[in-house]
Amino acid sequence: MTNERKEVSEAPVNFGANLGLMLDLYDDFLQDPSSVPEDLQVLFSTIKNDDSIVPALKSTSSQNSDGTIKRVMRLIDNIRQYGHLKADIYPVNPPKRKHVPKLEIEDFDLDQQTLEGISAGIVSDHFADIYDNAYEAILRMEKRYKGPIAFEYTHINNNTERGWLKRRIETPYKVTLNNNEKRALFKQLAYVEGFEKYLHKNFVGAKRFSIEGVDALVPMLQRTITIAAKEGIKNIQIGMAHRGRLNVLTHVLEKPYEMMISEFMHTDPMKFLPEDGSLQLTAGWTGDVKYHLGGIKTTDSYGTMQRIALANNPSHLEIVAPVVEGRTRAAQDDTQRAGAPTTDHHKAMPIIIHGDAAYPGQGINFETMNLGNLKGYSTGGSLHIITNNRIGFTTEPIDARSTTYSTDVAKGYDVPIFHVNADDVEATIEAIDIAMEFRKEFHKDVVIDLVGYRRFGHNEMDEPSITNPVPYQNIRKHDSVEYVFGKKLVNEGIISEDEMHSFIEQVQKELRQAHDKINKADKMDNPDMEKPAELALPLQADEQSFTFDHLKEINDALLTYPDGFNILKKLNKVLEKRHEPFNKEDGLVDWAQAEQLAFATILQDGTPIRLTGQDSERGTFSHRHAVLHDEQTGETYTPLHHVPDQKATFDIHNSPLSEAAVVGFEYGYNVENKKSFNIWEAQYGDFANMSQMIFDNFLFSSRSKWGERSGLTLFLPHAYEGQGPEHSSARLERFLQLAAENNCTVVNLSSSSNYFHLLRAQAASLDSEQMRPLVVMSPKSLLRNKTVAKPIDEFTSGGFEPILTESYQADKVTKVILATGKMFIDLKEALAKNPDESVLLVAIERLYPFPEEEIEALLAQLPNLEEVSWVQEEPKNQGAWLYVYPYVKVLVADKYDLSYHGRIQRAAPAEGDGEIHKLVQNKIIENALKNN
């Protein structure tokens, strides 16, 4: 037989689940060949004339006349699609199913004798070589799909992925653990449970959020890390909430027992930190509870030097998920080169551990999973493990979700879901094996639902029987997984009963020895750790100077495009104006051009830049144009990939319509790669509060709590321009409330050159003790305002200025007006129309840290000063007024009058009607400039 004939003749073997349909079509063909498509006519002709081809099809076609084969196919499809509903995945308290589809042989009017007369090939194309008949194959399928792992994959739209999973699941397979490996697995479980029991006995009532009931999580993580090491994956990023965290810290990151017990005893744990540097732990000066802390373990495993990181996490469940994704992507990106970064998904992988109540309950999970296949955010597949103890504090599943499983929300992202019985440790290992194989093959997420229970209450001081008495009657009687697996090994003759109990006691002995090393007298008596000395000062200006020719060379390069690249004529006119600052005396650099020049010089310095946000490539207000589009072909060109002498990458992406996940991602990216200048830009600053959890619990407090540094920059468009209460305010007051201990820099600028110098200063601070978040109340209409634009000589030298003033005659000034951002520009333009030398406008460019010294020095130069005014466009209870008042009050003291001009206190940020806005805005300006 020729190769060509062989390919044609063997094609029917792949009918698989479509065999019932093919039988119908084959019968139609026998009646009328023209009734089927031409390609099937050729195929069926081959079958008809060759008895050696596809015996399953020919032998069953006669049986199909009474619908037998169709019933068999429906049974097979139901087992694949709904077998999980009868799977043995609940260690205790199985739910009562109201509606379970037909899954038994007799449900389809079939019996053993009938099925034994049908080829196994009807069940799955590769079963004909394994089983004698369909009955044997279906028994195998029932055992597989109704066993300790419940598989859900038929919802996946991709045929290749679905077919791969079907074959992998249905091919006879068993985790081949030899006796030594089984002993090792038992020891892992003994350590996991023994640790919890020791803490429970010796620190009664202390919160630890025990892992008991889903103990298998630890060996699952260890298996994952081992597989990753064998594949050469060097970086593992783990995110989880507090449930089981202490156990993961001790048995996955190998945090010494002495350190953990020290934390329970409130003594200094750092004296027990391994001296070999294999474990990295950081701490802030205010600290955090022990079950929020993370760490980094470095280990040589199977020839791979692995870095295993457990991210710090607040109590806000699931919010760490995008942070872990960002950290992973940072580990995968090569940014020390010109152009765009190259991403190697094989370098790192994320593992995100969820709770069963929180996974469907918190929207951040959907936002994060949506990042999975996006160019700017993909990490090549995340492993999600649900530690499913089937309760959320006191809330049972019936009140926690509207779906059968907590994992059902993941189906929309076309990912496989495996539910596994937490008491069957070998099954949990197999679930990990399949998940890791799928990730390696398809670079997509996998969800494993580890179905167990919670041994105690939400925390160890809680009594669960108050609200959940019936489940806990059974849980209290249920044996631990350590005992279940240990007895299994005893029954298999792998260990003896004495060995089992001896090792359990050995774990307790090791814990007691660790406990004995800790001196109770070593109580920590310093409630405030010292902050880094570098945080005593504001962000320092970058004083590097540039020649005119240097900046011109950069500008020319940014305005040079590939031959034949067709830019929209309207846009080209805008871009061509960027030559004017270099070839016209009155040429000015506007905001967008200042940003481009700053970015280019930063790239030349070797600092990579990553800018993301909704519409950030063009800019919400059509000002940036960092990515150009050929109007004829649609091809793109990014000028900042082609900067002369560029030493680092420029990465820019339009983000999905998400705030919390995207900001969390960028935060995580910058924490992992502190050299990266990460910027998140809000479409409008008003929408930034969708990320408030990231701001509150990570960005502004992480260093104080965990010693975790971040230099993430936020661009938040903010200004009152008559666009209503949802397109006016970035809630400046919220950021000023979060500002303390020099934990950030908050600015509202009025000068493009100051913006240039600010960006350079922020970039220079990265990967140093000085680094901190930067919050920019970025402009909207001011993007094209000539008052904001500055001549090129303000860019060639100098540095960031915290306050700006116009020229003035000191002895004539009787009134100083302090304002910021657009309010300052509005006042300046109004004053230009009616000049008054007695009024001095001062732009407060940097709001935090507040420039007290600079303002004090300025006021001291004005001998006839009578009044100081703060003017803002926000309502009095919003904006900066309540923040600046204590500072200004001290500066003014009893020497000058102090006044406020702005909107009155309001519940909403701004007026909804544009005309009313103008009236209010003009009245503020008029009253502020009025010299009493």
From Swiss-Prot:
What CDD domains does this protein's entry cite? Answer: TPP_E1_OGDC_like
Q: Which GO terms label this protein's molecular function in UniProt?
A: oxoglutarate dehydrogenase (succinyl-transferring) activity; thiamine pyrophosphate binding
Which Pfam family is one of this chain's hits? Transket_pyr
Which cofactor is essential here?
thiamine diphosphate
Transmembrane helix listed as a keyword: no
Which processes are annotated in GO (biological process)?
glycolytic process; tricarboxylic acid cycle
**A GO-annotated cellular component:** cytosol
Query: What keywords were assigned to this record?
Result: Glycolysis, Oxidoreductase, Thiamine pyrophosphate
Under the heading InterPro entries, the entry gives:
2oxoglutarate_DH_E1, 2oxoglutarate_DH_E1_bac, DH_E1, KGD_C_sf, ODO-1/KGD_C, THDP-binding, Transketolase-like_Pyr-bd
Which residue stretches, if any, does this entry annotate as coiled coil? none
EC numbers, comma separated: 1.2.4.2
The record's listing under SMART domains reads: Transket_pyr
Catalytic activity, reaction form: N(6)-[(R)-lipoyl]-L-lysyl-[protein] + 2-oxoglutarate + H(+) = N(6)-[(R)-S(8)-succinyldihydrolipoyl]-L-lysyl-[protein] + CO2
Taxonomically, the superkingdom here is: Bacteria
Q: Quaternary form?
A: Homodimer. Part of the 2-oxoglutarate dehydrogenase (OGDH) complex composed of E1 (2-oxoglutarate dehydrogenase), E2 (dihydrolipoamide succinyltransferase) and E3 (dihydrolipoamide dehydrogenase); the complex contains multiple copies of the three enzymatic components (E1, E2 and E3).
Q: Which family does it belong to?
A: Belongs to the alpha-ketoglutarate dehydrogenase family.
Summarize the protein's role.
E1 component of the 2-oxoglutarate dehydrogenase (OGDH) complex which catalyzes the decarboxylation of 2-oxoglutarate, the first step in the conversion of 2-oxoglutarate to succinyl-CoA and CO(2).
Q: Which PANTHER family match?
A: 2-OXOADIPATE DEHYDROGENASE COMPLEX COMPONENT E1 (PTHR23152:SF4), 2-OXOGLUTARATE DEHYDROGENASE (PTHR23152)
This chain's protein is named 2-oxoglutarate dehydrogenase E1 component
Instruction: Name its species.
Output: Staphylococcus aureus (strain MRSA252)
Task: Provide the organism lineage as a comma list.
Answer: Bacteria, Bacillati, Bacillota, Bacilli, Bacillales
